[in-house]
């Protein structure tokens, strides 16, 4: 294990990509990389190193990548474009060092950036867009990245003592050869990724910050001769390293990027992730899910199309009700509080929608607890939704566990209980669901994966969450073998052989 205690003087560094500020002479260097794609773990053919500095403001990183200028692919791309054909380098940081969440930061040779959050060992979510700085410079034989990541960028556990231990992984992609070099013996395409991060020791700074984003909008409809005025604010308060409070008052999400176009001919609802900053920021503690099958909390439900019951009105009013339907609901307020300590985390999320014509706003509440031990994490996530137009109350309770009996095996499971009471239509149902997964990597070239999903016919978490289907069972086992020790003259970089079987049953079919 590598523990680096870094110098803690305040640094005056200009983030311009040139790495020519005097402070870089004090930096710790890291040069040990492995070729992890293909997964040979050999010494890389190309040289690269990382420079690391810190002060009370955050972490400074310098990437030095040896490469002839005429071979560098520096294509501009959209933020978070994972498949962009360009040379890249970056890192992932587990600020708590517990293997539950890691934040990734990537910079392309063009200067384009990507950031996201890793959970469940190697599952990444790119909806998180953070506020950090980077710059790139390319000369004849090297290209460089300067990066600054503030301590306020993500929630961190409150720890005692002079130092904080985080875990890091650095990487570099050479696009022309599609080779990846990493400082750990793994990558996100392997079954083990986050658990392989190297520990680093930084000074334990006490940080606090508060950001306000007020707004005022005025719209004038000259046809209807109506003037609409709206004002509100979003507040992000990082109380200290472990506590964070976010408040949105009558928020305006008009600047959020649109969803991707999805053509769906199935009977299942399409899941859309939330790109609204308030709901994507500081959400990792509440992110309890089962791959793409379910999400206990789907924040896209908050502010979605209102509920209506136009049939309760007489014909003229019924027609007016139908004509008044809107596709989104304004939000009166939303609040999120999270607190993380060395062994215990908890959080609260609540939101209330505004009343619309012929509709009443819904209320959403969620409470999260998580207890962390040396090799096991136990959690509870509960949600409650009130939908007054439907006279509907929905409760969901979920228990989750992540267990690592050794460094080669990982077990995670989630148990879900749901209950719906709806006066309109006299609908009452209780359901249960379960997810189990075991992954094992006895050697670097062999892995096993056992999995189980179950939803009974009355499971319904869709009021505040998302589930792809009900009355469903899926179980299976998969084994894989990877070969990457091919000679330089071979046409192959790596081969992978997988053998698996499974059984799937739903109300529609069995396979």
Task: Explain the meaning of each model-derived region.
Residues 330, 394, 406, 410-511:
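Exposed, low-structure sequence patches enriched in small/polar residues
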Residues 17, 212-214, 247, 337, ...:
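Membrane-embedded beta-strand positions of outer-membrane beta-barrel proteins
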Residues 89, 210-212, 229-235, 274, ...:
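Hydrophobic, lipid-facing positions within transmembrane beta-strands of outer-membrane proteins
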Residues 67, 151, 174, 216-222, ...:
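Transmembrane beta-strands of outer-membrane beta-barrel pores
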Residues 6-365, 370:
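Structural preference for beta-rich elements and adjacent junctions enriched in aromatics
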Residues 59, 243-245, 343-348, 373-380, ...:
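Repeated loop/turn-to-beta-strand initiation elements of outer-membrane beta-barrel proteins
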């Amino acid at each position: 294990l590598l523990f680096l205690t870094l110098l803690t003087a305040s640094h005056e560094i200009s983030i311009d990509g040139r790495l020519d500020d005097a402070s870089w002479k004090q930096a710790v260097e890291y040069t040990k990389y492995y070729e992890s794609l293909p997964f040979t773990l050999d010494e890389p053919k190309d040289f690269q190193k990382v420079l690391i500095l810190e002060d009370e403001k955050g972490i400074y990183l310098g990437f030095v990548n040896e490469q002839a200028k005429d071979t560098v692919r520096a294509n501009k791309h959209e933020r978070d474009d994972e498949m962009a054909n360009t040379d890249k380098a970056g890192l992932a940081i587990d600020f708590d060092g517990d293997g539950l969440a890691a934040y990734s930061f990537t910079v392309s040779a063009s200067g384009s950036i990507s950031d996201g959050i890793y959970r469940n060992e190697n599952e990444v979510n790119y909806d998180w867009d953070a506020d950090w700085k980077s710059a790139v410079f390319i000369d004849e034989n090297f290209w460089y990245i300067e990066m600054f990541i503030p301590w306020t960028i993500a929630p961190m556990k409150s720890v005692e003592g002079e130092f904080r231990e985080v875990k890091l992984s650095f990487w570099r992609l050479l696009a022309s050869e599609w080779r990846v070099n990493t400082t750990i013996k793994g990558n996100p395409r392997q079954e083990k990724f986050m658990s392989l991060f190297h520990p680093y020791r930084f000074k334990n700074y006490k940080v606090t910050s508060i950001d306000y984003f007020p707004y005022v909008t005025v719209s004038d409809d000259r046809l209807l001769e109506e003037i609409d005025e709206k004002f509100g604010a979003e507040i992000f308060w990082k109380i200290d390293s472990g506590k964070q409070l976010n408040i949105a008052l009558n928020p305006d999400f008009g600047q959020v990027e649109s969803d991707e176009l999805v053509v769906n001919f199935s009977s299942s609802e399409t899941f859309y992730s939330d790109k609204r900053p308030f709901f994507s920021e500081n959400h990792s503690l509440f992110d309890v899910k089962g791959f793409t099958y379910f999400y206990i909390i789907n924040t896209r439900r908050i502010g979605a199309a209102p509920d209506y019951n136009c049939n309760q009105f007489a014909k003229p009013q019924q027609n007016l009700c139908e004509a008044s339907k809107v596709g989104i609901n304004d939000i009166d307020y939303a609040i999120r509080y999270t607190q993380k300590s060395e062994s215990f985390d908890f959080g609260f999320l609540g939101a209330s929608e505004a009343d619309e014509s012929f509709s009443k706003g819904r209320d959403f509440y969620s409470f999260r607890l998580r207890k962390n031990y040396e090799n096991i994490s136990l959690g509870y996530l509960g949600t409650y939704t009130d939908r007054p137009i439907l006279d509907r109350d929905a409760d969901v309770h979920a228990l989750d566990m992540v267990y690592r009996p050794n460094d080669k095996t990982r077990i995670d499971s989630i148990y879900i209980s749901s209950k719906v009471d709806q006066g309109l239509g006299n609908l009452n149902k209780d359901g249960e669901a379960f997810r189990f997964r075991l992954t094992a990597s006895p050697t670097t070239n062999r892995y096993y994966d056992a999995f189980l999903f179950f939803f009974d016919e009355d499971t319904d978490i869709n009021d505040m969450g998302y589930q792809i289907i009900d009355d469903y069972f899926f179980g299976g086992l998969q084994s894989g073998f990877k070969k990457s020790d091919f000679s330089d003259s071979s046409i192959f970089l790596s081969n992978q052989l997988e053998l698996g079987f499974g059984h799937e049953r739903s109300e529609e079919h069995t396979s």
